[in-house]
Amino acid sequence: MNFKYIVAVSFLIASAYARSVKNDEQSLSQRDVLDEESLREFRGIGGALLSAGKSALKGLAKGLAEHFASGKRTAEDHEVMKRLEAVMRDLDSLDYPEEATERETRGFNQEEIANLFTKKEKRILGPVLGLVGNALGGLIKKIG
């Protein structure tokens, strides 16, 4: 009789443990799904912010380019204009990465292309902000 109780209690403990493991697995998979959904949301928000930032920079660069194109230019203005044109090309290549990588990277393997595109994204942010700051500073100086 004691043996029956021992077997019954062992069976209850084993089934409780199995349910506990199953619940843990389900909660982990639910957590993974929630984590993945939140990552997708963050990526979506980041993509929207990047798109808005690119649009704003393009608009600002076009406005500055029109300003410099309409009047007489000094050598410094000409240099700023050249930089703005380069920035516009880089921003356009971010919008159409397939075309840009085809044009600029013929003969490279896929890893080199990915590295080049990542470097281009990193290379744009610093100089664009500096260039816009310098151009706006120059405009404010001329106006004031």
From Swiss-Prot:
Post-translational modification Isoleucine amide, affected residues: I143
InterPro entries reported in the protein's UniProt record: Bombinin (IPR007962)
PTM-bearing positions, type Serine amide: S70
GO BP terms, alphabetized: defense response to bacterium; defense response to fungus; killing of cells of another organism
Record key words, sorted: Amidation, Amphibian defense peptide, Antibiotic, Antimicrobial, Cleavage on pair of basic residues, Cytolysis, Fungicide, Hemolysis, Secreted, Signal
Tissue expression remark: Expressed by the skin glands.
Domain of life: Eukaryota
Record's keyword annotation contains Secreted: yes
A Gene Ontology term for the protein's cellular component: extracellular region
Location of the protein in the cell: Secreted
Leader sequence segment: 1-18
Propeptide: 19-43, 74-123
Protein purpose: Maximin-10 shows antimicrobial activity against bacteria and against the fungus C.albicans. It has little hemolytic activity.
Family membership: Belongs to the bombinin family.
Name of protein: Maximins 10/H3
